[in-house]
Amino acid sequence: MIMQEWFQNLFAATLGLGDLGITVGLVVSVIVKIVIILIPLILTVAYLTYFERKVIGFMQLRVGPNVTGPWGLIQPFADVFKLLFKEVTRPKLSNKALFYIGPIMSLAPSFAAWAVIPFNEEWVLTNINIGLLYILMITSLSVYGVIIAGWASNSKYSFLGAMRASAQSISYEIAMSAALVCVVMVSGSMNFSDIVAAQAKGIAGGSVFSWNWLPLFPIFIVYLISAVAETNRAPFDVAEGESEIVAGHHVEYSGFAFALFFLAEYIFMILIAALTSLMFLGGWLSPFPQSWGFIGTPSAFWMFVKMAAVLYWYLWIRATFPRYRYDQIMRLGWKVLIPIGFAYIVILGVWMISPLNLWK
């Protein structure tokens, strides 16, 4: 709000544009906020790939990137330049228009979702009351990019990978949505700020034990597993199983077009980390009592720490577990996670109307 008012005063009063200046100031402030979100987000993607290689290398008793720049810190930029300057090729019999629309359709929702993600009570582009519903809606659109890319490539490997990815995403989206419905039930809102505020209340209010991860622990586990499968990350990355279908719907893409898919995948990972922090880990709330001074004060710092912890968990999962078979993934989703999710909604409803309600 402070930035918006400053730009509106600048264009309306200082530059003498009147009512037009108020509108221009609003538009400019929104553009500036978008840039402030997107540039750090893209840099985070770059260095997330670096830390992924370092962490997995450490777990496998390797060094990881250590040549390009001090400690390999320039390696992400070398990878970016390599992809940007590679030739973008496509199969002769592919559908040219849809071939290039696919990566854009995958990337656009990953950027658009950040419009409603708050980093603290003030740092948010758009604070709407249906923020969670918006996230579920906008992220579900990315599957269209995968399907379009697989079909337009005119390759059996691409098409099979796209079918696997879309079926897996749709299946685990049900389980993840059921888990998030439980959070909405105990919070009484789909506004992210209200959900975080609700985690500071209840019987254990003001402590780490009041965050949703503990009272909703079974559904928290369902959510974490579903989130990994939803983003097609290991051990649920059968959509690009190298030993079976080469690289799935990525197989015919190179250069900048492949970079868009790569960027979308890692932005969705960071988005899931932010969503996990907001819904289950208290968002910007501190794990320490407020009487401890600065470290007990809610701030964006704690939001970023929790996001980093979830991202590390993603990397640990990839380095630890072998890839599941496709039939095992579908069985886990439909026969285990989805039934648990819907059963817990009923259990939670009974719990909340009982005398043992923890969220009063």
Swiss-Prot record:
Membrane topology qualifier = Multi-pass membrane protein
List the subcellular locations. Cell inner membrane
Write out the GO biological process terms.
aerobic respiration
EC number(s) reported in the record: 7.1.1.-
* A GO cellular component entry from the record: plasma membrane
Catalytic reactions of this protein: a quinone + NADH + 5 H(+)(in) = a quinol + NAD(+) + 4 H(+)(out)
Could you tell me the keywords of this UniProt record?
Answer: Cell inner membrane, Cell membrane, Membrane, NAD, Quinone, Translocase, Transmembrane, Transmembrane helix, Ubiquinone
Q: What domain of life does the UniProt record list for this protein's source?
A: Bacteria
GO molecular-function terms, A-Z: NADH dehydrogenase activity; oxidoreductase activity, acting on NAD(P)H, quinone or similar compound as acceptor; quinone binding
User: Which InterPro entries does the UniProt entry name for this protein?
Assistant: NADH_UbQ_OxRdtase_su1/FPO, NADH_UbQ_OxRdtase_su1_CS
Q: Which PROSITE patterns match?
A: COMPLEX1_ND1_2
The residues that cross the membrane are 22-42, 97-117, 130-150, 170-190, 208-228, 255-275, 292-312, 336-356
Q: Which family does it belong to?
A: Belongs to the complex I subunit 1 family.
**Assembly with partners or alone:** NDH-1 is composed of 14 different subunits. Subunits NuoA, H, J, K, L, M, N constitute the membrane sector of the complex.
Its annotated function is as follows: NDH-1 shuttles electrons from NADH, via FMN and iron-sulfur (Fe-S) centers, to quinones in the respiratory chain. The immediate electron acceptor for the enzyme in this species is believed to be ubiquinone. Couples the redox reaction to proton translocation (for every two electrons transferred, four hydrogen ions are translocated across the cytoplasmic membrane), and thus conserves the redox energy in a proton gradient. This subunit may bind ubiquinone.
Its protein name is NADH-quinone oxidoreductase subunit H
Gene that this sequence comes from: nuoH
